[in-house]
């Protein structure tokens, strides 16, 4: 299938070929949800920690004798029922990440791309190079009316990244960093012509069994 190539000036720059295998698949909401959950789990710092009964400071002496006081028996002031006691089954420092099958990650990315195209929110740009002023880029984006936009390029252009850095609602990623979560978080997905070729190679590589990483 073919799609028009646009410019940042809302002009036309020809057509690009979109592989139906990657852009016309039936979006799988369940698969995308699994990939997003996996990405967000990997992002968690996992630095949460509370002290248990064996870690809080305090005496290890028995508070009072076992029998004869009329009180409930107690063995330690560090027990969780006391104000200064340790927590029971509290959070510990750990890694929340887990493995997800490469084929599932690939299908999730294909589903996200296909969903954006089906919604009419996928745009192919000729290039983003040459725009290095924030004010200039802001004017262009307002005319295009894309809303919150994710721009995917083969390699992030430094000038464009610098121009977009101070604008709310526009993010730039290289092909290797394109991921389901960021695609779904934005209204419009804009892929440069070079980025489109890189994305095809990346998906072809996953299909062939090459090592692949998804930014999380």
From Swiss-Prot:
Coiled coil: none annotated. Pfam families: Ribosomal_L4. InterPro entries: Ribosomal_uL4, Ribosomal_uL4-like, Ribosomal_uL4_dom_sf. Residues 47-77 are annotated as: Disordered. GO terms for cellular component: ribonucleoprotein complex; ribosome. The keyword Magnesium does not apply. One of the primary rRNA binding proteins, this protein initially binds near the 5'-end of the 23S rRNA. It is important during the early stages of 50S assembly. It makes multiple contacts with different domains of the 23S rRNA in the assembled 50S subunit and ribosome. Forms part of the polypeptide exit tunnel. Part of the 50S ribosomal subunit. This is Large ribosomal subunit protein uL4. The gene is rplD.
């Amino acid at each position: 299938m073919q799609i028009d190539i646009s410019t940042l000036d809302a002009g036309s720059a020809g057509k690009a070929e979109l592989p139906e295998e990657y852009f016309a698949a039936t979006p799988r909401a369940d698969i995308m949800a699994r990939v997003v959950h996996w990405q967000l789990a990997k992002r968690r710092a996992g630095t949460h920690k509370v002290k248990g009964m064996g870690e809080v400071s305090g005496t290890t002496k028995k508070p009072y004798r076992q029998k004869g006081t009329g009180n409930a028996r107690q063995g330690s002031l560090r027990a969780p029922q006391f104000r200064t006691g340790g927590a029971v089954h509290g959070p510990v420092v750990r890694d929340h990440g887990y493995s997800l099958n490469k084929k599932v990650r690939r299908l999730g990315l294909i589903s996200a791309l296909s969903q954006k195209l089906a919604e009419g929110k996928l745009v192919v740009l000729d290039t983003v190079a040459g725009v290095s002023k924030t004010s200039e880029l802001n004017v262009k984006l307002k005319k295009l009316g894309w809303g919150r936009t994710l721009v995917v390029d083969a390699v992030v252009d430094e000038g464009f990244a610098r121009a977009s850095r101070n604008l709310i609602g526009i993010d730039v990623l290289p092909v290797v960093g394109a991921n389901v979560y960021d695609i779904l978080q934005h209204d419009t997905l804009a892929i440069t012509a070079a980025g489109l070729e890189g994305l095809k190679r990346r998906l072809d590589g996953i299909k062939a069994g090459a090592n692949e990483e998804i930014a999380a």
